[in-house]
């Protein structure tokens, strides 16, 4: 991790007036690949995106509580300005309501923290670039939400659907640029799914990653 002095020097020299967006995610590669590509596509001198990576010792620790700890550690080490943002990007499918509630409560109590949760997982956000989930039958929407494997050897349903739509998909290697050309559609579709935006996270099929995408694109 960069020293406090090097980060402050970077901000002073290259991003003097930039709003800092720091992203920590449950996934090791998927979110990093996507948001690096999005930030490059929407390069703006007033926005600087920094994506945290887990150390080798932390590779298998992806719980929301650990992702939140990454952001808290960052906040303690570096001086943040009033318009900076710390974003927690997590999935719903693997975690208990109690854990998510604790994390959501802590985020709500911190002016810098924002939680972008996908229900069931980040692949929903990626799929929304290519598919309008609101046009699916109730039965298909339920399959998306349940995101089951058809066997032990197959991927979860949304990964298989994403591979069908993209032609090729692996969480550590995929064509993010293909998706980003449709990011405006993804945002509109995610908003349409977000029936109760005041809830702490989507209780049904939905993703709040669109809020982070809008921030990276400087649509605030």
Language model regions located:
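C-terminal accessory helical subdomains adjacent to catalytic cores in phosphodiester-
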Residues: 2, 6-18, 33-57, 75-87, ...
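Conserved beta-strand elements of the Class I
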Residues: 20-24
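Conserved residues at beta->alpha junctions
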Residues: 25-26, 90
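Phosphate/oxyanion-binding active-site loops and adjacent basic polyanion-contact surfaces
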Residues: 27, 31, 59-68, 204-208
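Alpha-helical scaffolding within the catalytic cores
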Residues: 69-74
